[in-house]
Amino acid sequence: MLRTSIASSRPLLPSSVCPKAPAQWLCTSRARRVNTATRRYHALARKSNAGRRCPLTPNTATTSQFFQKAASSTSTKPPGPSDADVRSPASPSSRFSLRPESIPKTPQSPPVQGQTSPGSEVLPPDHESSTPPPPLEGPKSSRLRKLLYLFLTAGLAYAGGVWYSLRSDNFYDFFTEYIPYGEEAVLYLEERDFRNRFPHVTKQINRRVTVPKDEGAQVTIPSGSGLSWKVAEEQQEATDMTKKGRRMGTAHANEPTKDIKVAEKAKEEVKSKSAAKKEDVAANIPIQEALEPQPAKAEEKNLEAPRQPAVPAVTAIERLVQDKVDEPVVQDLVKVFNDVISVISADESASKFAGPIAKAKEELQRIGDRIVALKKDAQESAQEEIRNAHAAFDKSAAELIRRIDEVRTQDAAEFREEFESEREKIARSYQEKVNTELQRAHEVAEQRLRNELVEQAIELNRKFLSDVKTLVENEREGRLSKLAELSANVAELERLTAGWSDVVDINLKTQQLQVAVDAVRTTLENSDVPRPFVRELAAVKELASNDEVVAAAIASISPAAYQRGIPSAAQLVDRFRRVASEVRKASLLPENAGITSHAASLVLSKVMLKKQGLPTSDDVESILTRTANFLEEGNFDEAAREMNSLQGWAKLLSKDWLADVRRVLEVKQALEIIETEARLRCLQVE
């Protein structure tokens, strides 16, 4: 059945499973560098024309490492799908499909050594008849899936890093320093956590009224102010500086007014800044560099004149020194101002800015003194506040000590009152306990006295009763001496009566058991056909329910015997005669007899003579004769033993008769055991 189901299911498999396309040889990692137009793929599918090979020349580039490997592998057996250089063909549902018929076969050439180097590129053989197929593109779904997995893994790793940064300080430092946007992400999560834990704090912060700061007047620093990378302007030609034309005159005429405006503007800016921020004077004072005049070009005839110095020698401006003020802001301001002085001193027109620079120095000196005074005032006010704070602290400490002393005194009074009340309670409870113990001791003593009195009364009553009994016994012995003997006789009679009743019950059960056994025997002997005796045997088992011997005897009987019945003696004898005739026919058969042996034995059994009397030999005829004699005598046990000694076909033919005889003997033996047990019960009672 199993083979049939498997065989029937085999034709269904090709219809439900996708047809397997033949494997293809793909290019190795070195062959992938070859141009796409010259790339070729070789199929393993073999057809009737598989013996045809592509013509190759010994000097062509077809004897590369790729074709050597292909030839060596195809000469033994086609490689399986597990090979590293073999890729399964595209499924029919893929974007591009390539039929095996259009793919040229693998050239099976013997491996050639020494023709190609390991690093040389592989070029397939040129075939004029075959056109290169379009290259196969790998499935894009795997790339998208890998990219998606990469993004998911990176996102999970980034989220795990942010989460672990909130737990570990060392990892927090590493994550915020080396991971892009790590610090922003961690700070955002911490801020969200803080807002979730303290929502009211953020509301209060948002509700605060922002007071605008007084930052003073807005200071604008010109683009040309500050230090310059030029040490000095390049000198123009002397002729241009000495000649004063219309442009030069205008430039020199505007220079003093421009210098005055620049100085006044710087002074106003310094004043506004010092008034706006008294303690913070760290801003740079904008000083516009001097405008250098643009010299006009003279005519070509003046170029040949000798050069003369255009500007007198530059006098250096003294630098500002502030040694009394140690404020970093003032020192930075002085440094910036000195840098400005250095730049102006390096210029040719430094003498023009001497006046504004001097005024600026005075203003800066005044500002430094003002800052020192403000700092001193602030220190004095701070010292005053510290002294006031110390005084307030001392006062509050004294007040706190006074309160602590008052609380301590009050607590001591309360503790004393509680102690007194607790002491009174303990004394009261102890007194009550002592009184209770005394009362219990008195009660115990009184109860002991009562018990002694009761014992004495009981003892007196016992003595009185013993005296009365003695007197009564003496009187009874005199008048009622025969009453005790009569009572003893009655008790003995009752005992004998109870014993005889048990004997009667046992005898009754034994008789009932004997009757049940006789009923079973009668049923077996008087039946002409096998008759079941289940009811009779059940009655025997119920009457001897407590007897293990009877139960074992009944259990030894085969269930088929009392359910179907057993044949009688006459039936066994009649059946033996039929079995004996069949056994005589097969008495001459060997164990492995054929049809000829059966026919010969049947013929010879007709001419054999039957034995009479008590033969002593062990042949089949002698055994049958002895068995018939035992059956006529009624000795079924010996008859069964004789028939059991048969061998071969004779024993096989008498097997059923032996089984019936065994069942009959088992039933008879069980009935004999039950009858014997019943007799033993009667003997035990006697």
Swiss-Prot record:
The keyword rRNA-binding does not apply. GO terms for cellular component: MICOS complex. Residues 357-495 form a coiled coil. Keywords: Coiled coil, Membrane, Mitochondrion, Mitochondrion inner membrane, Transit peptide, Transmembrane, Transmembrane helix. Residues 43-146 are mitochondrial matrix. It is a single-pass membrane protein. Residues 167-686 are mitochondrial intermembrane. Residues 1-42 form a transit peptide. InterPro entries: MIC60. It comes from the Eukaryota. It is found in: Mitochondrion inner membrane. Component of the MICOS complex, a large protein complex of the mitochondrial inner membrane that plays crucial roles in the maintenance of crista junctions, inner membrane architecture, and formation of contact sites to the outer membrane. Plays a role in keeping cristae membranes connected to the inner boundary membrane. Also promotes protein import via the mitochondrial intermembrane space assembly (MIA) pathway. Component of the mitochondrial contact site and cristae organizing system (MICOS) complex. This is MICOS complex subunit MIC60. The lineage of its organism: Eukaryota, Fungi, Dikarya, Ascomycota, Pezizomycotina.
